[in-house]
């Protein structure tokens, strides 16, 4: 022992005390276990179970016995030093462990335990104090003082292991037990690592059985006949309890963890899995490729492909029927979804190669390889021609066709083909907008603001706008229906600047004018500005653009406004004059209300200005046009 120096005492047990020491030669920290009783011969020392078992067990998850020293009739075991035990690690936690850390801890415990059982020993005293740690990353099984060989004959001592981790057969004083008692202790430790609390903290052996019954429920005689024999031998009467759901007791455990825990804590020791079987539970099966079974994960991908067969493909329709081709191309996704998915190795490659498989089949070539080359990226020209001819008919399904083209990994040269497939209607709309923006005809611009349609074509650009408006009505869009609803429910307040647009219904939400441009009506907003400029050029009075405020003076109170709000003679439709009176001459679209007066006061709207007497012989518009809901 002169080669080691002792630093401090780490713990004290039934059979010995543990000291922290350091090797003088290497400076390595060690744990020195000093046995309490004296040993007077080496033969007596070598017969110790701890020495016999640890000499045979060399595993990464079993604490390593470095040396055995007998000096002055005292026996010393030199172990590798571990920072703490699992009980200290649990006690110092102020929050729960993540499940990944718990899985790592339990995996190491079961690995070491499987090695112990494989070599013919079982521990008999597994508890958190006997699991040494270097943080949650490394766990090793220690303290083999109660270890027995499995092949040794019963009877065994009935008082083994700490009471909270004792298996039911040991609590019922069985003398014929074996390695399943270690598996039960692992289940108790697993629950404690999840909850940071012991699962069965009984004050006595009978109290521990009662606590086990409260969690697992009273076992039936058919489930564990040996247990009823042991209980009758002790004159023990089973408490009648119903089982609790382990998920409610351990809410932070996954379903795989609950499945493993339920099997580790079986009443009947024959029904508990062995340590090596527990390692094969789904709880520990992580990281294998998705879509491949664990049996096939070790095989090369070529074997998996041969087993599952070639990837599925869709045969295109005959070239004589171009529309049928387009439908077949679009509906290839639902057809494939109904087929059984046999493999999912690199699914994005399989998705990208569907159009290539179509071209391979059409040209009479064999099936493409499992990892297809990306040089043949163009769709067949006949299918493109069919789609180009029927682009108007396929308009409602444009989203699907767009998704299919985007999956085919097109190159930069192939994006020109997209204009033939789906953008004909949108390009026409953009053309019409540009023509409207460049048009100098104020009538067309005023009509674009109010969405009016004259009875006869006027000017050169009217036929184009009529065609575009009919196109818009044929295709139901959210934009046109929203604007029609908006204009049908509009009201007119005298003196409101037209720059603010038509006043919305007071009961509806207010739609700001800026949102029109964001919804694709930028051409219409420019028309509004031109009309406002002509209106302001006629009247010299200034109008407020902020709507109705507390200090607002209506424009009809001003003397300079003149005949803006008076009835005017309608001008002929064929030759509109640039003045404002010609703009007033446009008849509104039949069935659609024109400017109306404000209805009676509505809650939530700013109050109207006080009523005044008619000025300059103006007509009382509120009496002439009653309010209309």
From Swiss-Prot:
Q: What class of enzyme is it?
A: transferase
Q: Which SMART domains match?
A: S_TKc (SM00220)
Report the subcellular localization: Cytoplasm; Cell projection, Cilium; Nucleus; Cytoplasm, Cytoskeleton, Cilium basal body
Q: Give any Pfam family that matches.
A: Pkinase
The active-site annotation reads 125 (proton acceptor)
According to the UniProt entry, which residues carry Phosphoserine?
161
* Biased composition range(s): Polar residues: 460-482
- Tissue expression, per UniProt? Expressed in embryonic heart from day 11. Highly expressed in the uterus and at lower levels in brain, heart, lung, kidney, skeletal muscle, ovary and liver in adult tissues.
Cofactor requirement: Mg(2+)
**What PANTHER family has UniProt attached to this entry?**
MITOGEN-ACTIVATED PROTEIN KINASE
Record's protein name: Serine/threonine-protein kinase ICK
Its gene? Answer: Cilk1
């Amino acid at each position: 022992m002169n080669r080691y120096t002792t630093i401090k005492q780490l713990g004290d047990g039934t059979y010995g005390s543990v000291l922290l020491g350091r090797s003088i030669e290497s400076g390595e920290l060690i744990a020195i276990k000093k046995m309490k009783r004296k040993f007077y011969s080496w033969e007596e020392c070598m017969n110790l179970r701890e020495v016999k078992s640890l000499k045979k067990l060399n595993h990464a998850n079993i604490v390593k016995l470095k040396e055995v020293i007998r000096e002055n009739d005292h026996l010393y075991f030199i172990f590798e030093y571990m920072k703490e035990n699992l009980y200290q690690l649990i006690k110092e936690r102020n929050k729960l462990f993540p499940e990944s850390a718990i899985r790592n801890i339990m995996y190491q415990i079961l690995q070491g335990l499987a090695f112990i059982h494989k070599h013919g020993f079982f521990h008999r005293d597994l508890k958190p104090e006997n699991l040494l740690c270097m943080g949650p990353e490394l766990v090793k099984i220690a303290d083999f003082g109660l270890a027995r060989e499995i092949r040794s004959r019963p009877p065994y001592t009935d008082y083994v292991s700490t009471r909270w981790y004792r298996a039911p057969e040991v609590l019922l004083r069985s003398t014929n037990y074996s390695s399943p008692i270690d598996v039960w202790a692992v289940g108790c430790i697993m629950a404690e690592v999840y909850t940071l609390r012991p699962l069965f903290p009984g004050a006595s052996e009978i109290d521990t059985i009662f606590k086990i019954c409260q969690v697992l429920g009273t076992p039936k005689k058919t489930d564990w006949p040996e247990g009823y024999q042991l209980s009758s031998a002790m004159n023990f009467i089973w408490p009648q309890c119903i089982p609790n759901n382990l998920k409610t007791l351990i809410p932070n455990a996954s379903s795989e963890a609950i499945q493993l825990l339920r099997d580790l804590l079986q009443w009947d020791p024959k029904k508990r899995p062995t340590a090596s079987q527990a390692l094969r539970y789904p709880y520990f099966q992580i990281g294998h490729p998705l879509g491949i079974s664990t049996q096939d994960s070790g095989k090369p991908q070529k074997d998996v492909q041969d087993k599952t067969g070639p990837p599925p493909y869709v045969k295109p329709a005959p070239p004589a029927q171009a529309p049928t081709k387009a439908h077949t191309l679009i509906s290839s996704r639902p057809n494939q979804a109904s087929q059984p998915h046999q493999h999912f190795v690199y699914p994005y490659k399989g998705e990208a190669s569907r159009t290539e498989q179509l071209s391979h089949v059409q040209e009479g070539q064999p099936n493409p390889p499992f990892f297809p080359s990306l040089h043949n990226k163009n769709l067949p020209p006949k299918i493109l021609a069919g789609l180009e001819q029927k682009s108007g008919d396929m308009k409602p399904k444009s989203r699907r066709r767009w998704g299919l083209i985007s999956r085919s990994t097109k190159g930069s040269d192939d994006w020109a083909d997209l204009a033939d497939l789906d953008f004909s209607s949108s390009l026409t709309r953009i053309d019409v907008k540009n023509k409207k923006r460049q048009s100098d005809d104020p009538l067309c611009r005023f009509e674009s603001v109010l969405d009016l349609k004259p009875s006869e074509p006027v000017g050169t650009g009217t036929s184009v706008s009529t065609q575009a408006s009919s196109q818009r009505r044929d295709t139901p869009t959210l934009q046109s229906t929203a604007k029609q609803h908006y204009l049908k429910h509009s009201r007119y307040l005298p003196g409101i600047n037209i720059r603010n647009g038509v006043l919305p219904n007071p009961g509806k939400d207010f739609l700001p004018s800026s949102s029109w441009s964001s919804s694709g009506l930028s051409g219409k907003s420019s028309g509004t500005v031109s009309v406002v400029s002509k209106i302001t050029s006629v009247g010299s009075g200034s109008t407020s653009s902020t709507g109705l405020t507390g200090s607002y003076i209506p424009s009809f109170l001003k003397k300079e406004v003149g005949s803006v709000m008076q009835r005017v003679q309608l001008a002929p439709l064929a030759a509109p004059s640039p003045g404002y009176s010609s703009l007033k001459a446009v008849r509104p679209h039949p069935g659609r209300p024109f400017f109306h007066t404000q209805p009676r006061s509505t809650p939530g709207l700013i109050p109207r200005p006080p009523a005044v007497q008619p000025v300059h012989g103006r007509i009382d518009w509120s009496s002439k046009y009653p309010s209309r809901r």
